[in-house]
Amino acid sequence: MPVLADEGFEGPTKEVFQTPHWFDVGIGSVNLYLNKATALTIFAALFVGVIFWLGFRRAKIIPRGLQNLCESAYDFIDLQIARGVIGEKGTRYTPYLLVLFSFVLICNVLAVVPGAQFPATSRIAVPMVLALVTYVLFNYAGIKANGAGPYFKEMIDPAPTAPLWIRVLLAPIEILSTLIVRPFTLAVRLFANMFAGHILLLVFSLGADYLLPKPPYVFGAASLLVAIILTAFELVIDALQAYIITILTAAYIGGAMVHGEHEVAPSEELASPAPAGVPVSARA
């Protein structure tokens, strides 16, 4: 890289992610603006909404075309993630999980679409908003399933039967994990993966553009080949990151819903009386 820099090669700069404002509008103390990152985020949201609206506006008993695609996506999220992770009660959260998966996937895939070539999720603001919505939702699910008192009580005292010093140690860990670490890691994981992947793709793409016209051409060809391979790999990462954030969201919702449920200990199960007519030897 230093040799290339001395010869005039310029790698990715901060302007790649700090896209210039197309226009600014000041309303009092509020400054509204539109740039490439914001436009792509709005496009992704509208694209997802329009696709599902077109797919279900004239639903038929035997789905075809776009309706078949939308129903397949819904069934996948509902069966594999909502019910598979949360349980039967997870169906009520399927619409949110479906929209989350679809929106993140489109935002990610825009990184390799000509004309866009920018993943909106590589701006930390987008993953932070998604994590905030998930944060509110899984806490709401926990409060609705268990009640506010039991939900926060177990968060403060997750092991009531443990010795006092363990309870004191676990309380801040549980509170930090639920209220701070989960939304933070959810946002940073998506942001960091998309940011790093886009930087890597840009380095080899710009390298190929710089080296191809110059002999020896083998270096330019190698850089171009790596860029093509990374583009294909980026598509896999795009889908994988959308899946990961969706399944983690489902796991957080499911964990919050069972928060505070009492599990029967083996000793309690053995101590319970056997049903009438069952021999004592059959209790074990």
Swiss-Prot record:
Phylogenetic placement of the source organism: Bacteria, Bacillati, Actinomycetota, Actinomycetes, Frankiales
Key words of the record: ATP synthesis, Cell membrane, CF(0), Hydrogen ion transport, Ion transport, Membrane, Transmembrane, Transmembrane helix, Transport
Subcellular localization: Cell membrane
Ranges that cross the membrane: 36-56, 96-116, 124-144, 161-181, 184-204, 217-237, 239-259
Protein's name in the database: ATP synthase subunit a
Native species: Frankia casuarinae (strain DSM 45818 / CECT 9043 / HFP020203 / CcI3)
Membrane topology category: Multi-pass membrane protein
Keyword Cell membrane: yes
Family: Belongs to the ATPase A chain family.
